[in-house]
């Protein structure tokens, strides 16, 4: 049997919202595999599907710059939120975003080599690091292009902790921005159901079937219940099917359609998503309970 650490239990507990002993039991049953442990908890009805933003820790800000038919969404990281809120950091973030939208580099490495008044972008980041006393780094960016009959919607939440960029066809910029606000708030995974892979569908269907069987539902209605739960799940993760935050009587797709538009794409950044910081405040509590 795989040895289960307090850190693993803490991570699963944070992702799932399950109690300490339920998290430990799931990890034991899955031999320490975090994804399988999450599925185990879902099958038992203890946890829901984890959102993409479950593991967020790094500091920094995001920004969006739109120029004509090109837009760039950028994330710049720092070590503390104090530095991220400083004027030097915000200034270099805006410079970085403009530089990227103007030059369209292929990746972060190419972006760092872009020429600036002081040498290269990498030189500018080093200078900002020296000025702030913290490492300042370009983590990622995405360049988005649109056609003349399309509009960008750009929205920054909490001063740039979250950024959302959308493209809609036909509808105006205000509609596109409304959708961007929704994306920032709700965090969809996919544009619509056509983007969900068959593998993902079968995986979720299997989990819902186990969950339904564990509830003791009659065998003759299990499949119907499973498909109903799968349909609800898809309506929660696909932008087009989500209830629009500004008018829950409409889905996002129907809202855009009411403006004579069509959803084309979206991208959402949240500062530090997928990056973990060292955490110690809960570890001792978990160790104590694991050893009981």
Curated annotation (Swiss-Prot):
It is found in: Cytoplasm. One of its GO terms (cellular component) is cytoplasm. Residues 80-83 are annotated as: Involved in Mg(2+) ion dislocation from EF-Tu. GO terms for molecular function: translation elongation factor activity. Gene3D superfamilies: 1.10.286.20, DNA helicase RuvA subunit, C-terminal domain (1.10.8.10), Elongation factor Ts, dimerisation domain (3.30.479.20). Keywords: Cytoplasm, Elongation factor, Protein biosynthesis. Its main location: cytoplasm. Belongs to the EF-Ts family. Associates with the EF-Tu.GDP complex and induces the exchange of GDP to GTP. It remains bound to the aminoacyl-tRNA.EF-Tu.GTP complex up to the GTP hydrolysis stage on the ribosome. PANTHER family: ELONGATION FACTOR TS, ELONGATION FACTOR TS, MITOCHONDRIAL. NCBIfam families: tsf. This is Elongation factor Ts.
